[in-house]
Amino acid sequence: MAIFRDYTNNQIDHDRSIEDRRRHRQLVEKSIKENLGDILSEESIVGESKNKKFKIPIKGIKEYQFVYGKNSKGVASGVGNEKRGEKLGNGNKKLAKGNQGAGNEEGDDIYETEITLEELMDYISEDLNLPNLDQKKYSEIVTETSGKKRGYQTHGIRPRLAKKKTVMSKIARKQGKKRALKELESDEELERFPFREEDLRYYRVKLKPKKDSNAVMLFIMDASGSMDVTKKYLARSYFFVLATFLKRKYNNIAFEFIYHTTVAKRVDEFEFFHKSESGGTYISSGINEALKVIEEKYPPAAWNIYSIYASDGDNWSEDNEKAVAAVKDICEVSNMFGYAELLPSTYTTTMYHKFKKEITNEKFVPVIIKEKKDLWDALKIMLRKELKEE
């Protein structure tokens, strides 16, 4: 027997567009998450503002409709455990793909949506689901954050307006006037009784001190001649995403920027992401400079220290043992030392293999980026390891 529901009192319950909008939002979010790796490896994001927009291709949702069949023998049927969106049967549709000739079926609707760099970082945060920084015993900075409501006051900003208390104040004033008129035996009636400035009450908010962990990120980049334009672009993209993301997620985090050839230099953020160098490669020079920065400014007992180094893995052979010793030293004073090797040469043995063989400290996290699409996977490995709660 058919059951007919009465929607006369609630027109929203049978609004099919609500379900369509929900599915559309899911489709958009799914497409964005699937394209995170492509955006990070292909888009020029270094140095862009938070309002920089990126285009994301999205497959359109088609309306359900009845169509004529193909006069084929038999039809496909399910067994009861199919999932939503799953296609039954192979069909004989011929679509034009690449250089395979012309097809005879309608294609998929593809359109583009735009998201800003700030929204991109939100999706990265959601995808990674990172924990908070490790808590150090003596590494806390006291900051003020929004606290609890502590009573009322007669002045304040509109967002803190206490509506209920304001109405009660108005009613009390109205009742007081009624009593005064009664005592004066006046026949005056109170018809309209508007709010006055004196009725307004605002929440008094006491800022609550909050303790945050100290943390410093040391970004070290090989800027030598063997790092060509593509490698330097990948390294800078790698560091830029890390810096932008961590600045948004954590309140108190310091950054130090170092690049090196045969000698290392401490630079500011702009110079790190935009200046180019050429010359030979002593990996130990960059790592030792980071150790000096730690010794001068960031005592390990009071700071969470995270160091990340990016290079193509080529190093002057006489410096190899010094580089291994320097990495071992920095692992001892850091929460984590990440080594990212970019587009390594296939003709020579790079430092990735030497480091991985000789450094057994669990704080050493090596990743290798053989092509652009590996950038996102390397970022996920580094971030999850770097900020993992102990």
Swiss-Prot record:
SUPFAM superfamilies: vWA-like. Residues 77-108 are annotated as: Disordered. Residues 89-103 have a biased composition (Low complexity). InterPro entries: Spore_YhbH, UPF0229, vWFA_dom_sf. It comes from the Bacteria. PANTHER family: UPF0229 PROTEIN YEAH. NCBIfam families: spore_yhbH (TIGR02877). Belongs to the UPF0229 family. This is UPF0229 protein Cbei_0567. It comes from Clostridium beijerinckii (strain ATCC 51743 / NCIMB 8052) (Clostridium acetobutylicum).
